A protein has these predicted regions:
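Histidine-anchored nucleotide/phosphate-binding helix
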Residues: 11, 15-33, 40-41, 267-276
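Conserved nucleotide-sugar phosphate-binding/catalytic loop shared by glycosyltransferases and other
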Residues: 38-86, 305, 309
């Protein structure tokens, strides 16, 4: 390690990615030398609207620059379509894929906002997105980072996207002929995962970095930085939680994109009516909409505190003095919640009151 430290850049596609980036930098910057080296945050607009996160990230003091990234999907370039046809022949398909990989990486050049080669460490969340093709085509080494907590356990995109002759394709990616994400590309130095032991298929580049290590020893000041970066009007929220009506008891309701909108309103009204009191006393109700929930909770549940649906639920772990008497979810897994005395998971049986089980695949909402 040089006396100047190592300069860093992070490519993020979601708020969760930015959250993990924030945690990583809080730890790295405990070393003054690394803090001086600086970090740049790149926010890709390809699949997510970050709103004014850029401004709040700039104010956090963690980044020397926060830049928007107009990352382009392959469909933006119609000339690539010819390389995506199935010829019915493995050799021809692989030759087409080689051409696709090279051409896609080149076409992205005008949309890359920084010179990646000037950074010592490049961290990419979800390198299956176009940025992975760009870096591999231009022979730039990078670190891949797990898209979500243990996400490869639930959906191994590298193997699924390349099912059929996977070993051959992995060999080709290792030699940078084609591109495969999540640790299989030549220019991917390592693939950070939370827990390698739970992953059914080993990969030599998996690097176990438990997310718990990023959260267990945060100072109060560091927690305040996290909250300030992801929650707008932080001070106003904290005052409301401390002094607002029925603040002595708190209940958090996690919404989900269930059923049609009218049924959804009824579901959450019923939940609040049944579980919104603690020991017979009305509680202060907070609602955290699911990122894909389009119901207007500000309008339909205006008497309650409606949290921004964009920020990761884990951020609530760091709000000063925030403890919930009860957290209620229908189908959402609540393992990441550390701030509740009671977690109430209502499950499939509860949903059967509102909808026949065969109508939808409910697992798709969690």
């Amino acid at each position: 390690m040089s006396s100047q430290g190592r300069s860093r850049i992070y490519v993020c596609h979601t708020f969760y990615h930015a959250y993990i980036t924030c945690l990583k930098e809080l730890h790295i910057q405990r070393d003054p030398v690394q803090k001086q080296a600086g970090a740049v945050l790149l926010l890709s607009s390809m699949s997510n609207d970050f709103g004014n996160l850029k401004e709040r990230a700039e104010k956090s003091g963690l980044f020397t620059e926060v830049l928007p990234f107009d990352e382009k999907e392959e469909t933006y370039f119609p000339e690539l379509a010819q390389y995506r046809t199935d010829t019915g022949n493995l050799v021809k398909n692989m030759l087409q894929r080689i051409c696709f990989t090279r051409k896609f990486g080149k076409l992205l050049e005008p949309y890359i906002p920084v010179d990646f080669k000037r950074f010592d460490d490049i961290y990419v969340f979800c390198d299956s997105d176009p940025i992975g093709y760009y870096l591999s085509t231009h022979k730039i080494y990078y670190h891949a980072v797990e898209d979500g907590l243990n996400c490869i356990l639930y959906y191994d995109t590298a193997r699924y996207d390349n099912r059929g002759h996977f070993k051959l394709k992995a060999w080709m990616s290792k030699h940078n002929l084609i591109f495969i994400q999540n640790g299989y590309n030549k220019y991917c130095l390592d693939m950070e995962v939370n827990d390698a032991s739970v992953l059914p298929y080993p990969c030599e580049k998996y690097l176990e970095k438990p997310r718990k290590e990023l959260t267990d020893d945060l100072t109060d000041e560091e927690k305040d930085t996290v909250v300030g970066m992801f929650i707008e009007n932080k001070d106003k929220l904290e005052t409301t939680l401390r002094e607002g009506m029925n603040h002595e008891h708190k209940v958090l309701v996690l919404t989900e994109p269930l059923c049609d909108l009218e049924t959804r309103k009824r579901i959450f009204r019923d939940i609040i009516a049944q579980y919104g009191s603690i020991d017979g006393e009305p509680a202060q109700i907070l609602m955290k909409p699911h990122p894909r929930d389009v119901l207007d909770y500000e309008k339909e549940f205006s008497q309650y505190i409606i949290l921004d649906k964009k920020f990761p639920m884990e951020i609530l772990n760091y709000v000063k003095d925030l403890k919930f008497d009860r957290v209620i979810s229908v189908l959402t897994v609540t393992d990441a919640i550390l701030f509740a005395k009671e977690k109430l998971f209502l499950g499939e049986d509860f949903m059967d009151r509102y909808e026949a089980p065969e109508i939808q695949d409910r697992k798709s909402v969690v």
